[in-house]
């Protein structure tokens, strides 16, 4: 027994018809695609309204605005970030390394004040 049974033939025919309909549904009409209207932010609305009159000075003002935004985002902000990192993470922390003070003996002079350390008092009743 070779070939398809009547049930299998019917199923294959229905699948082919379904595929044909699906492919036909994928074709776009001339009105498609329908895109939603773009919502503009307040700055974009302002600049579109400002640039409707195409005078040269308006274009120059817009160019200066765009360049200032570029400088702010690509120069100033990175410099601030690098400065913050260098200030708080790379530089040595104050008092991070503690050095022992040198010993002071009688007769030594303290450099900051010029004070001379007096000789130690002798206590005859104590041995050392």
UniProtKB/Swiss-Prot annotation:
It is a single-pass membrane protein. This is NADH dehydrogenase [ubiquinone] 1 beta subcomplex subunit 6. Keywords: Acetylation, Electron transport, Membrane, Mitochondrion, Mitochondrion inner membrane, Respiratory chain, Transmembrane, Transmembrane helix, Transport. One of its GO terms (biological process) is mitochondrial electron transport, NADH to ubiquinone. Pfam families: NDUF_B6. Accessory subunit of the mitochondrial membrane respiratory chain NADH dehydrogenase (Complex I), that is believed not to be involved in catalysis. Complex I functions in the transfer of electrons from NADH to the respiratory chain. The immediate electron acceptor for the enzyme is believed to be ubiquinone. InterPro entries: NADH_DH_b-subcmplx_su6. Belongs to the complex I NDUFB6 subunit family. It comes from Gorilla gorilla gorilla (Western lowland gorilla). The modification N6-acetyllysine is found at residue 24. The modification N-acetylthreonine is found at residue 2. Its main location: mitochondrion. It is found in: Mitochondrion inner membrane. The chain crosses the membrane at residues 68-86. One of its GO terms (cellular component) is mitochondrial inner membrane. Complex I is composed of 45 different subunits.
